[in-house]
Every structure is written in C-alpha cells, then in structure tokens.
Amino acid sequence: MKWLGESKNMVVNGRRHGGKLSNDHQQNQSKLQHSGKDNVKAGRNAGERRSSRCNGNSGFEGQSRYVPSSGMSAKELCENDDLATSLVLDPYLGFQTHKMNTSAFPPRSSRHFSKSDSFSHNNPVRFRPIKGRQEELKEVIERFKKDEHLEKAFKCLTSGEWARHYFLNKNKMQEKLFKEHVFIYLRMFATDSGFEILPCNRYSSEQNGAKIVATKEWKRNDKIELLVGCIAELSEIEENMLLRHGENDFSVMYSTRKNCAQLWLGPAAFINHDCRPNCKFVSTGRDTACVKALRDIEPGEEISCYYGDGFFGENNEFCECYTCERRGTGAFKSRVGLPAPAPVINSKYGLRETDKRLNRLKKLGDSSKNSDSQSVSSNTDADTTQGRNDASK
C-alpha cells in the first residue's frame, strides 16, 4: 500500500473485507516488527524531523484547512471513534458499524507483558452502544444535513445523562479532541462533502459493512478533503492491549519508515479496496490524511483505494473487489472443478479498461438486473391474475 507518499515499504495488518492474510505475509510482518521496534523510541523523539519531512519533497501533500493534527493516543482514538460512530453513523445507517473496543480486555493468551507492568489507566474501555435514542440521533443528522450547524448538532448528540457521566472524568483537552472527532464525522453529511456513506453487504467477511460513494463529479488530482483518516502510532504494548486478530484489526498498518504500527480510523476507514482504485491516500498533517482522485470520478461511483499486494492473502487471492470480479481474478478466479473462463481468440488486441467504458458496462449490468427483477415481478403478477381468473371460472 502506498501510504502517505511512501513507496512499497508498508506492511498492512488487518482486514476491511475478505482479509485473509497468508502465512508468508504474517511472517514477514512479524520480522519487520521485531527488526523495527528498536527504532520506535528514536522515531517518536524526532517529531520536528517528521513534521519537516511532511512538508518537504517526500511526496506528501500540503495540509488541509479542515483537519488539524488530532494529537490523540491510540487508546483515545479507539474510544473517540467508537463513540463518534455510534452517535453519527450507526443511527443514520441503521446498524452498528465496526468498533475497536469490542470487549473489556483481550484474552490472556494474547497478552505479552509481565505482571509487574501497570497499565490500568490505559486499559481500553469496552464499547457500550447508546440505546433507545437511535431515532432521535438520526433526526439530529437529518437536521444537520439541512442547516450544517456543527455546534448545534454536537450539543444535541451529546445531550442526556450518559454524556454527563462520560465527560465527568475527561479534561478539557480530551473533551476538545472528542468534539473535533465528532465534527469530522458530521462533515461527511455537509452539502459540499462530495460523497456519502451507504450500506454495503458485498463482502463475505462483513454482515453490516459500508462504502463511500461520490455525490458529485471529481476530477483527476482533486482532493476529497472531508474524507478524513486519523492516525495514531501503536506501541507493541498497545497492540497487545487493543487489538484482537480477526475482530478489530481491520485498520492497522505497519510503517517501516516510522518503525511502528499505526492505527487508521475516521471516515476514510470506510473506503473499500479495489485492485483498480480511483483514489489514493495523501497526508494532511502529522497524523491525519485524506484522499486524492487518481482519475475522474462520476456521481454514484464508489470511492476506492488500494490496500496492498498481499492484503487479501498471497497476491490478493481472496480479494472480492469489483475489478477482480470483472477480470475473473482474486476470489473470482476459477478453482479446481469450476469452469475456466472463455479463452481470448486474439490476445494481441483488446479493449483497454477506460473509465467511461467500465462505467457504461456497469450501468448496463445494473439496468439488466433491474429489468430482470421487473420481468420476474410482472410474470408473477400475471400468473397470479391468471390463477384468480381460473378460480373464478
């Protein structure tokens, strides 16, 4: 995955959909983690060096005016993201989206620190969904889509007894960080965001997934500045405390440039992978990012990024993206006992995968599905009518 202007020096750990990592990939990742952990401390103390590198000639883009540096620890990012999505996205979509703190504490077998270590103040807080307010919260989001009043929406979202208890143990800075994180999610519904979040049940590993879809035309090299990702570095201890394999490790990557694992959450974490992506991630600060269009994007087209060569198994053999389905590769590649794809008569010439042609084919496929469903419905109605007429006779 080319992450924030880096070349192929990033190992992605986790899953977004169909995330079946190969053994070789896991072993390589483990080697990278052990080889890089000695340099984590030095990397953290080099804040000025990292900051200047972001503004230099390393391939990073300029900072966005929308997203200040979050400054959240991994634990804070997990807690803030869980609560923000439960207040904003879950009521709107009608189901619970992915959460980081899915249980009170990782199983004992997954912990690798000694009994003498004291981390009680850093233990992750188990996520508890806000119940009984879903319709009320959804109305708040619908009102925000009309008036776009951030402060008013935040006040309505955080009203109630639960909020008083929640903020009781938070200092002013923690309250500010949480508020800014909620604002990031609210801005997804702004008129000028240029995208929307919709349910997505395409992928086998997700029952209640989501996708990001463009609502306006984006030109090549445009930045989708409100489609924000938030990053927090993970120490080895934090990895053991916060992550559970196959459960909440959907947005974790390992940076060989910074020699540490990084947690990646926020609205951009809902971007799905495609082997022919139309966007890429670009930096907007030390620990934030947005996406940049690689080609023209039409309204209604899903926004996608490339996760990496081995994210869905060896050579992405388990990938379920649209491109793999169209090409007959990844999870759609013919297996033993299944019919092989029709051979190409003349492989010297072929139609290039242009955006317009692919969009036209997709629209034709969608219209064909709709006509088929309408045909089935009309036939069913006709059969029912005929049956009634026969019965009346």
UniProtKB/Swiss-Prot annotation:
Subcellular compartments: Nucleus; Chromosome
Domain of life: Eukaryota
Keywords from the named record: Chromatin regulator, Chromosome, Metal-binding, Methyltransferase, Myogenesis, Nucleus, Repressor, S-adenosyl-L-methionine, Transcription, Transcription regulation, Transferase, Zinc
UniProt keyword Metal-binding, yes or no: yes
Biased composition (Basic and acidic residues): 35-51
Biased composition (Low complexity): 367-378
SMART domains in the cross-refs: SET
Biological process according to GO: DNA repair; methylation; muscle organ development; positive regulation of double-strand break repair via nonhomologous end joining; positive regulation of isotype switching
One Pfam family this sequence matches: SET
Subunit structure as annotated in this protein's UniProt entry: Homodimer. Interacts with HP1 proteins CBX1, CBX3 and CBX5. Interacts with RB1 family proteins RB1, RBL1 and RBL2. Interacts (via C-terminus) with FRG1.
The name this protein goes by in its record: Histone-lysine N-methyltransferase KMT5B
Gene expressing this chain: KMT5B
